[in-house]
């Protein structure tokens, strides 16, 4: 994913910006021909969680208690491992906020090339996808579901980068949502010899029976996420605190740090 908005995000992580500062930064990012209002509308659809109040622009995650934050727990199945030559074939997602599941999302995606190995892992066949909606339609619906929630997944870079690249290739732009990896968070909060989704499913007593299907795997990920949140220190209060803690290099003492 390009780092187009990185400078903007770094500044907003440190402090809110005045409207004038924010507009000037948009012009700096976009060049001489940029229209700040148009650039703002693009940013709003990119997943960056902005908050406008009292003539200032805030990064919402720096203010929102994580217990009130909007999280989107995501899992995908794909027809290969390379986001530049393969595609998502199934998306499952859960909107989780205030300790409740607000809504779920699930869709297959039309594809004519499912390798036998992928069918063996997921059970998804070419025939199952022949009447499914095209990828552009599914991604449009998914972006409306995701909005500016924090994107949560087990090994988040895989799911996020796959979907972000697919969005870009289908003219929706890259995703810039904050992202949280439940492998990293679990390594800092849960004592376990391994951290794969399948292992934690059994080790933590979740016991969902279906693996390698998008919505079911997102349900397992949510249960892992909830167990992690219960172990957080009280000094972790905002969503930004949670993201910073998750991405820190420390791990829970005694863990073997295996995936």
Residue ranges: model-predicted function:
Residues 1-69:
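N-terminal accessory regions of nucleic-acid-interacting proteins
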Residues 2-5, 11, 16-17, 21, ...:
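Acidic two-metal-ion nuclease catalytic site recognized across multiple nuclease folds
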Residues 78-80, 184, 220:
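Short, glycine/acidic-enriched loop or turn micro-motifs at the edges of active sites
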Residues 166-169, 188, 203, 227-231:
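Active-site catalytic microenvironments for nucleophilic, acid-base chemistry
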Residues 179-196:
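Short alpha-helix plus adjacent loop in nuclease-associated cores
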Residues 213-226:
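Acidic, divalent-metal-coordinating active-site segment for phosphoryl/phosphodiester hydrolysis
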């Amino acid at each position: 994913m390009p780092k187009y908005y990185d400078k903007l995000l770094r500044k907003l992580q440190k402090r809110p910006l005045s409207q004038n500062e924010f507009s000037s930064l948009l012009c700096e990012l976009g060049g001489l021909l940029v229209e700040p209002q148009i650039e703002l509308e693009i940013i709003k659809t990119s997943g960056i969680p902005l908050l406008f109040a009292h003539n200032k622009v805030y990064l919402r995650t720096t203010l929102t208690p994580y217990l009130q934050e909007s999280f989107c727990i995501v899992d995908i199945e794909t027809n290969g491992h390379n986001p530049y030559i393969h595609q998502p074939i199934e998306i499952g997602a859960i909107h989780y906020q205030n300790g409740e599941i607000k809504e779920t999302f699930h869709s297959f995606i039309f594809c004519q090339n499912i390798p036998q190995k992928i069918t063996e892992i997921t059970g998804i066949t070419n025939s199952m996808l022949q009447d499914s909606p095209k990828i552009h339609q599914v991604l449009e619906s998914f972006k409306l579901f995701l909005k500016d929630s924090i994107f949560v997944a087990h090994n988040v870079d895989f799911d996020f980068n796959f979907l972000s690249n697919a969005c870009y290739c289908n003219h929706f732009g890259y995703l810039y949502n904050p992202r949280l990896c439940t492998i990293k968070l679990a390594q800092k909060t849960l004592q376990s010899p391994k951290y794969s989704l399948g292992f934690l499913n059994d080790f933590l007593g979740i016991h969902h029976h279906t693996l390698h299907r998008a919505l079911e795997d997102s349900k397992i990920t949510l249960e892992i996420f909830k167990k992690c949140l219960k172990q957080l220190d009280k000094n972790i209060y905002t969503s930004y605190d949670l993201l910073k803690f998750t991405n820190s290099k420390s791990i829970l003492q005694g863990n073997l740090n295996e995936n």
